[in-house]
Regions:
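A Zn2+-metalloprotease active-site environment signal
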Residues: 1-255
Length: 255
């Protein structure tokens, strides 16, 4: 009798029965916008077209080449010297001006964009929050019952703490695939990781993107292994010229 009951229960689609999937989606939409509103209230968003337009163009290029709906991704550039970028729920992609300044070419920045986009597309963001904060707490936040400190703590989980190694590797290698399909050389992304891993020794508190994405040298080596023997695309003169203009504008913002 008990065995029959357990068998019957095992045949139930509990995700559908309890409407958990729909609840999670609704919660993600609400808390994503809530998180961004909270973050924006304490930071300065960059709206200069000389900065936003080229970064938006890079994101659009990657999305278009990989059949990702560009319209759903909400790009935000913040005036902060730290080298950081992260994704928030509901497809918010946040990039600090300090990270753009740290990139030596467009392909490096595209690698970071691809990495964070992979976290969004693979649903890493909500999975991390549910694991570390809990779905019930997130639902409470989405219904207006979360206090400011709780919300700030959740944002910090995404902006300054690492995903596990498996998810970071998946995001890196997915970014490599995104870049190749977009006609962008992935090798500079590996070079970016190598370089910042070395610089972390001197400026650990400023390089949040590396400190929250550990094992940078190992990650770079996996990228190089992934792309070896492949015929990689080369950066065009047009891309180089556009990036030079972007860096000049960013340096003015940071000065």
């Amino acid at each position: 009798m008990i065995a029959a009951v357990w068998f019957g229960l095992s045949q139930v689609d509990w995700m559908k029965f309890l409407n958990i999937e729909q609840t999670t989606q609704n919660t993600e939409e609400k808390i994503g916008d809530l998180f961004w509103k909270m973050l924006k209230s304490s930071e300065t968003e960059i709206i200069s077209d000389s900065i936003v337009a080229p970064v938006d163009s890079m994101l659009t290029r990657i999305c278009t080449a990989n059949q990702i709906d560009r319209a759903k991704v909400k790009l935000h550039l913040l005036r902060k010297g730290e080298i950081n970028a992260f994704a928030l729920p509901n497809n918010h992609l946040v990039i600090y001006s300090g990270l753009i300044a740290a990139c030596e070419n467009e392909a490096e920045l595209c690698g970071v964009i691809g990495h964070e986009l992979a976290h969004i597309e693979k649903n890493h963001v909500m999975n991390k929050l549910i694991k570390e904060v809990g779905l019930s707490v997130l639902i409470s936040m989405s219904t207006g019952n979360g206090n400011a400190e709780t919300i700030k703590a959740a944002i910090k989980q995404l902006s300054s703490s690492a995903y596990d190694r498996k998810l970071e590797t998946e995001a890196d290698l997915t970014a490599v695939d995104y870049l190749e399909k977009a006609g962008i050389d992935p090798e500079p992304f590996a070079n970016f990781l190598y370089r910042l891993a070395d610089e972390t020794k001197n400026l650990p508190s400023q390089i949040y993107w590396i400190s929250t994405h550990p094992e940078s040298k190992e990650r770079a080596e996996k990228i190089i292994e992934r792309i070896k023997d492949r015929d990689l695309p080369k950066t065009s003169a047009k891309d180089s010229l556009r990036f030079e203009g972007l860096k000049k504008s960013i340096n003015k913002v940071l000065s």
